[in-house]
Design a protein with these regions (language model features):
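A structural motif corresponding to the C-terminal lobe/cap of the Radical SAM core domain
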Residues: 1-129
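Membrane-proximal basic amphipathic "stem/tether" segments
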Residues: 105-184
Length: 184
C-alpha cells in the first residue's frame, strides 16, 4: 500500500533517519509510465538511496512460475539458463527491443536520477541509446559509492578488500563479454 509506505518514509525522515529503498522495474506488463511512478515516488519522498533492480524471476519463486505459465520469459529462457544478475539485463519479454533497452538503461541511471531529478531530461535521452558496458560501469560505481553514504558500515581491511575484489571481478568479468545485450 503506497499510503503506508509514504507515511513510514515520512516518519523516518522526520526523525532524522536515512531511507534506503529497493525497487524492481521491468515486471511483466509494466509500462515505462509505471516505472516512472516508482521513480517519482522515490523522488517525492527524498529517499537517500533508491537502489533499483531489473526483475529476474529466479527458479523456484512464484514470479518464475507466473512467468512460465503466462509466457512472459524471452524465448529459450528456462531454469537452466536464467540470468544470475539483476544488474545487467532482463529475460522478461517486452513489447519491443527498443522498450527493453529503455528499461535496461533506466535501471542503470535510476538511483542517480532519484538523487539528481533535475537531470531526468538528460537521462531520458541516454535511455534511447543501446545498452552498453559504460552504463553498467557507471551504475556499479555510482551505486557502490552512494550506498556508502547511506549505510555507514565499519569494515576491517580484510572485509573491505573482499568487497572490492568481488566488485572488480564482477565488473571486469562483464566487460570481457562482447555482446552489449548480454543477459549474463
Amino acid at each position: 500500500d503506497l499510503k503506508v509506505m509514504s507515511d513510514a518514509i515520512t516518519a523516518l525522515k522526520e526523525n532524522g533517519l536515512r531511507v534506503y529503498t529497493q525497487n524492481i522495474i521491468g515486471n511483466p506488463g509494466e509500462t515505462f509510465a509505471m516505472a516512472m511512478e516508482t521513480f517519482n515516488f522515490n523522488v517525492k519522498h527524498g529517499v537517500d538511496f533508491a537502489e533499483c533492480f531489473l526483475l529476474t524471476p529466479f527458479y523456484g519463486t512464484e514470479i518464475y512460475e507466473n512467468c512460465v505459465k503466462n509466457d512472459f520469459l524471452e524465448k529459450g529462457i528456462n531454469m537452466d539458463n536464467m540470468p544470475q544478475s539483476y544488474w545487467l539485463g532482463s529475460c522478461i519479454k517486452f513489447s519491443s527491443l527498443k522498450e527493453k533497452d529503455k528499461f535496461i538503461n533506466f535501471h542503470k541511471f535510476f538511483s542517480f536520477g532519484v538523487q539528481h531529478p533535475y537531470l531526468l531530461p538528460l537521462i531520458k535521452i541516454i535511455m534511447k541509446l543501446s545498452p552498453n558496458k559504460l552504463f553498467v560501469l557507471f551504475n556499479r560505481f555510482y551505486d557502490s559509492w552512494r550506498i556508502t553514504r547511506v549505510i555507514r558500515v565499519k569494515m576491517d581491511i580484510v572485509t573491505l578488500l573482499g568487497v572490492v575484489k568481488m566488485n572488480v571481478k564482477y565488473i571486469f568479468g562483464f566487460f570481457l563479454k562482447t555482446d552489449s545485450h548480454s543477459k549474463f
